[in-house]
A protein has these predicted regions:
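Positively charged n-region of N-terminal signal peptides that target proteins for export
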Residues: 1-5
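Sec/Tat signal peptide C-region and signal peptidase I cleavage site
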Residues: 18-26
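Gly/Pro-enriched, hydrophobic low-complexity segments
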Residues: 28, 33, 103, 113-115, ...
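N-terminal mature ectodomain segment of secretory-pathway/periplasmic proteins
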Residues: 29-104
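A mature extracytoplasmic/lumenal domain signature
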Residues: 52-56, 77, 87-91, 99-101, ...
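Short, mixed charged/polar active-site loops
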Residues: 63-68, 92-94, 110-112, 175-177, ...
Length: 235
């Protein structure tokens, strides 16, 4: 299940003096505003480039593992998400994600690992794709119970945090909650957090984001040496 971190990356307060009824109305109004921004951005979104920081927290030993690099996202058609992560620190690796297929290239050992998650985890993969860049509010609400978190600033950019609880029992058992920070300016997620049972979580933050309409397919493809060593860990 660790591989699902790659596809995911791999996402204010209501005044206590208000009555519960008016507070619910205000929260709903703010959530609808987030949905509106997402729905306006979704049909126009074709791709982006950004710097990425991915943090994986293991609570039992209070340990954080941080990967730093860049990401390129390409969406040639709805629900067709292609991504390339190029991590430079602390260990160099490049991750290509296309649908349910994942490739991880380790240049130090000249090894690429191939994973096909579609056969055994098709439903989970489809859920994760709905968390991807350029999703609309209907995609999210079909698969998640969505509530308002509140306004926050991520990398100097104003955003609104929303919380998502999976409707699928299988996904809920593995990842009980997700959080997305949706840019108030672009309607695109600038931070994503994925919780696991207990207090472990994975957090991906995107900065220096450029929304681009014409990402070439070559920009989301691994450029592998001819003599690369190929492994299939799931076989």
């Amino acid at each position: 299940m660790r591989l699902f971190h790659l596809t995911f990356v791999l996402c204010g307060t209501v005044a206590l003096a208000w009555s519960p009824h008016s507070g619910a109305q205000a929260a709903d109004s703010s959530l609808q505003a987030v949905f509106k921004r997402m729905d306006e951005a979704s049909p126009k979104f074709k791709g982006l480039k950004a710097d990425v920081k991915k943090l994986a927290h293991v609570d039992v030993i209070n340990d954080d593992t941080v990967d730093i690099g860049t990401i390129v996202v390409r969406v040639p058609k709805p629900h067709d998400l292609q991504m390339l992560f190029d991590f430079k620190q602390p260990d160099q690796k490049t991750v290509q994600i296309e649908g349910a297929k994942v490739q991880i290239y380790y240049p130090k050992t000249n090894t690429v690992q191939d994973y096909d998650l579609g056969k055994n985890h098709k439903a989970q993969v489809e859920q994760f794709l709905k968390l991807g860049f350029g999703s609309n509010s209907r995609d999210l609400q079909d698969s998640f119970a969505v509530t308002l978190g509140g306004p926050e600033t991520i990398g100097g950019e104003s955003a609104t945090r929303i919380e998502l609880i999976p409707k699928s029992k299988d996904l809920l058992a593995t990842f009980p909650k997700f959080e997305l920070w949706i840019s108030d300016k672009t309607g695109i997620s600038v931070q994503q957090k994925m919780y696991q049972p207990g207090k472990d979580y994975s957090l991906a933050t995107y900065t220096n984001m450029q929304i681009l309409p014409n990402i070439p397919e070559s920009a989301v493809k691994l450029n592998l040496p001819k003599n690369v060593n190929r492994e299939h860990p799931l076989k």
